[in-house]
Regions:
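Nucleotide-sugar-dependent glycosyltransferase donor-binding/catalytic pocket residues
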Residues: 98-99, 129
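Conserved G/P- and acidic residue-centered "switch" motifs that form tight phosphate/ATP-binding loops
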Residues: 101, 118
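Extreme N-terminal starter segment of soluble prokaryotic enzymes
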Residues: 2-4
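Acetyl-CoA-dependent GNAT
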Residues: 7-89, 94-96, 107-109, 113, ...
Length: 175
């Protein structure tokens, strides 16, 4: 069956919000479930519900859904940070579809889109709780730039002293 990457649209909201919630609940340690629930609510309300503002295509940003037939299997996006930098965001893939090389294809699609938009560098951050993601970015040519302890919640972190790893990758070495 063919897998496609399609630009998110508002009709995708119910399925994508359920996916984001499910994946984050799977990641939540038992002693942080309440904190994760607040994070899920904030992420959906502050980012997904206003995806047109959070990922404006006019400035090179984009949010994609990963589909097979009509089933949404995952999401990923890039947000413009500066004229030269974008941030990889919301790289989520439902567990039943992992291990098939889709994450690599998603990342390659995001990087190629960023290159075509003229961006020089992609940055990202991920919680150390996401061991598979840490390993994936390490293997994908991303350079670790910083490790921090996130004390406050935002739409990028659950807070609660979770350690976050920040990465970068140069997309256009001569750019």
């Amino acid at each position: 069956m063919t897998t496609s990457f399609e630009i998110y649209n508002n009709a995708d909201f119910p399925e994508v919000s359920a996916l984001w919630a499910r994946i984050n609940r799977e990641l939540a340690p038992s002693d942080m479930r309440e904190q994760f629930e607040r994070y899920i609510e904030n992420s959906i309300n502050d980012e997904l519900a206003r995806a047109d503002e959070a990922y404006p295509q006019a400035n090179g940003s984009a949010l994609w859904v990963v589909k097979q037939a009509e089933t949404i299997m995952g999401t990923f996006g890039i947000q413009r940070i500066t004229d030269t930098d974008v941030e990889l965001r919301r790289m989520y893939l439902d567990g039943q579809y992992r291990g098939q090389g889709l994450s690599r294809k998603m990342l390659e699609h995001a990087e190629e889109h960023a290159r075509q938009q003229g961006f020089h560098r992609m940055i990202l951050s991920t919680a150390e709780l996401q061991a598979a993601a840490v390993k994936f970015y390490d293997k994908s040519g991303y350079e670790l730039t910083k490790i921090e302890t996130a004390s406050a919640m935002s739409n990028k972190t659950v807070g609660n002293n979770v350690r976050r790893r920040h990465y970068q990758k140069i997309l256009n070495p001569t750019g």
